[in-house]
Design a protein with these regions (language model features):
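N-terminal pre-domain/capping segments
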Residues: 2-3, 8-14, 21, 25-139, ...
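Histidine-acidic metal/acid-base catalytic patches
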Residues: 28-44, 51-66, 208-227, 231-315
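Acidic-and-aromatic substrate-binding clefts and catalytic sites of carbohydrate-active enzymes
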Residues: 50-56, 76-87, 109-123, 147-156, ...
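Short amphipathic alpha-helices and their capping/turn segments at secondary-structure boundaries
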Residues: 87-96, 129-134, 163-167, 240-245, ...
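A short helix->loop->beta-strand "cap" motif at the edges of active sites that frequently abuts
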Residues: 100, 138-139, 174, 279-283
Length: 315
């Protein structure tokens, strides 16, 4: 039987190349599920999943999130020192009145290209952002956007900026982290090296993986990582490999699939959760970007909750 690592890597290759079809799904072993009482498990939601369906009526939307069964939320949408149309303290009250707890937030600095000339500007932005998120009661600030990285010098500067953001955040009693997509798993050439190109280049990996350089180049006391397991697979990597390689640095997960959790057949969530629990990871957030036709985002996030709430492998 194929190892879980080889299997996940093969599935991700099919997915990226656009070759994956429904016939692949039966290859996955059936996951045993047992019914549980809704809301007994602590399941978090990244509110980006809901888009306008939430922002059009935040108070009603937050209550709906709670009714579905979610316990915690991870914020998105901070800008100009506000959460959408709301002052941060007002937004926090809306969330808490709905019976939810804000435990994390995604925020991106205004600069994507880091230079020696704009690092002070970025640092000042983090200082005011931290101040606002203290008012929101957030325990973690997470950057989900990858800065421009083309070479090792770029990585070095990015890591310095990340460490600085971590220092600012730590001083306020919070933690600072980074969230990946697929781009972080690209490779950059080592000095004197040329990366392979053309057909089959992906089968001849060389160079350094940006994600690894980020983890290895940042201070463990200042920077943690929130792994998006779906985007890791889409980056041609196996989440299990990284959970094994960086058991202390990866502290939070984004649980995501191509659409509603468990429907694509391409994500081995059972093994991912088992390894996460072994590593001591207990917090995760559902993220849903796309739903099928004739389904609302709220219906989609409910489907995700139901999948996790009835899965025997989720504590």
């Amino acid at each position: 039987m194929e190892s879980k690592i080889y299997f996940l890597n093969k599935i991700s290759l099919f997915s990226v190349c656009g070759l994956m079809a429904g016939s692949i799904a039966p290859v996955l072993a059936a996951t045993k599920s047992v019914p549980t009482v809704a809301g007994k498990k602590v399941i978090g939601l990244q509110i980006y999943s809901l888009g306008k369906e939430l922002t059009e009526n935040v108070p009603a939307g937050m209550k709906k999130i709670k009714e579905i069964g979610y316990s915690t939320i991870e914020l998105a949408g901070y800008g100009n020192r506000k959460m959408g149309q709301y002052e941060v303290s007002e937004y926090r009250k809306i969330v808490e009145d709905a019976g939810l707890k804000i435990t994390s937030a995604h925020v991106n600095p205004p600069e994507r290209k880091y230079t020696s000339e704009n690092t002070t500007k970025i640092s000042d932005w983090w200082k005011q952002t931290v101040e606002d998120h203290v008012k929101l009661g957030v325990g973690r600030l997470i950057q989900p956007g990858m800065p421009t990285i083309e070479n090792h010098d770029d990585v070095k500067l990015v890591c310095e900026v990340f460490n600085n953001a971590g220092e600012i955040t730590k001083a306020a009693g919070m933690k600072w982290g980074y969230h990946n997509h697929n781009m972080e798993f690209k490779r950059i050439a080592k000095p004197g090296e040329t990366l392979p190109t053309g057909p089959g280049a992906i089968l001849r990996p060389t160079g350094d993986v940006v994600y690894d350089l980020m983890v290895d180049g940042t201070n463990p006391d200042l920077v943690f990582f929130e792994m998006d397991v779906y985007w890791t697979v889409m980056g041609q990597m196996d989440p299990l490999d990284y959970l094994e390689k960086y058991p202390k640095r990866i502290q939070v997960l984004h649980i995501k699939d191509r659409s509603v959790l468990g429907q694509s057949g391409m994500m081995n969530f059972e093994n991912i959760f088992k390894k996460a629990y072994t590593n001591g990871i207990s917090e995760f957030y559902v993220e849903l970007e796309k739903v099928k036709a004739n389904m609302t985002q709220f219906e989609g996030v409910k489907g995700c909750f139901d999948y996790l709430n009835t899965a025997a492998f989720v504590k």
